Amino acid sequence: MAQVELKQVRKTYPNGAEAIFGVDMKIDDGELIVFVGPSGCGKSTLLRMVAGLESISSGEILIGDRVINDVSPSERDVAMVFQNYALYPHMSVRGNMSYGLKNRKMDKEEIERRITDAATMLKIDQFLDRQPNQLSGGQRQRVAMGRAIVRHPQVFLFDEPLSNLDAKLRVQMRIEIKKLQRRMNVTSIYVTHDQTEAMTLADRLAVINEGQIEQMGAPMELYSNPATLFVASFIGAPQINLIPVAFDGSAIVNGDLRIGGFSDLPMGVDLKLGVRPDVMTIDPEGQVMMNVDIVEQHGGENLIYGTIDGVFSGEGEPQEVCLKGSQTLLPNPDDKLRLRFDPDAAFIFRTDTGERLK
């Protein structure tokens, strides 16, 4: 196991396009950190740079005390698990798991011991003599993980390993990955665009946007204390409600919405009020009236979508919002609900820079 450190790491392509902009990051020994962000943000590029599959334009990457910029992928002592499993179709499960170890000329007894240990841990020991095409998607992903485990690497790298699985299996596999990582205590980097997956797996999240780290921290820290508009809108399901507002010197306003108690916000600047669906409540004395459009029933909770009377989006349409309620809160479409939210639980951002002001 080892610490991983990135120092001012950049990636510039020959045409001058920059993919990664001076990333600084330290990943502690035994930590599971998740790179999360939208497609094309640079998260997989950053992972591939750690793996040695993508060159570094400038900066340094260290595993332990060793700078690995010019070290070949096979010598970095990392193991990677891919989205598409990358199994050899003509080999058995045992053959896939042992292939890399045989190439290293490892002792046969040691190879068999490692395969047996990993297969037992992953509950695939009964499949060792099967071919990949005889396995389910989840079983194949376990084999891919087993192939990484038997190497006893210093660092695990996961590149969207659950993307090809159905929803139920994704939940099951992410629990297994978390349990496995805790048991082995191996430094791990996990890439995903699925923020629910990121929140449930990570010791810490690195939210990446356009090749830069917007914010790093524990999952609930980023949910409760987002540094930017991007982080607030990306982290959290359902998504945060964002309402355009302006500051008139004493209150933030949008049509019939007026919330006082502010004195230090800029005037003449477009602002966004961010309110999480779980901090909105029904109250006859609430600040706004919601017209119910759709109710999604999720078993233990309901998500209620609608628009707010007299409050408008940036396009001039009625502002859409989402309210998270208990399973007993089940209004009908076209019902009206008066809503209250605690201003102290809301956020205010500059629209132009994304900076959080409150």
UniProtKB/Swiss-Prot annotation:
Its EC number is 7.6.2.10. GO terms for molecular function: ABC-type glycerol-3-phosphate transporter activity; ATP binding; ATP hydrolysis activity. Gene3D superfamilies: 2.40.50.100, Nucleic acid-binding proteins, P-loop containing nucleotide triphosphate hydrolases. InterPro entries: AAA+_ATPase, ABC_transporter-like_ATP-bd, ABC_transporter-like_CS, ABC_transpr_MalK-like, ABC_transpr_MalK/UgpC-like, Mo/tungstate-bd_C_term_dom, NA-bd_OB-fold, P-loop_NTPase. GO terms for biological process: carbohydrate transport. It comes from the Bacteria. It catalyses: sn-glycerol 3-phosphate(out) + ATP + H2O = sn-glycerol 3-phosphate(in) + ADP + phosphate + H(+). ATP binds at residues 37-44. It is a peripheral membrane protein. GO terms for cellular component: ATP-binding cassette (ABC) transporter complex, substrate-binding subunit-containing. This is sn-glycerol-3-phosphate import ATP-binding protein UgpC. It comes from Roseobacter denitrificans (strain ATCC 33942 / OCh 114) (Erythrobacter sp. (strain OCh 114)). The lineage of its organism: Bacteria, Pseudomonadati, Pseudomonadota, Alphaproteobacteria, Rhodobacterales.
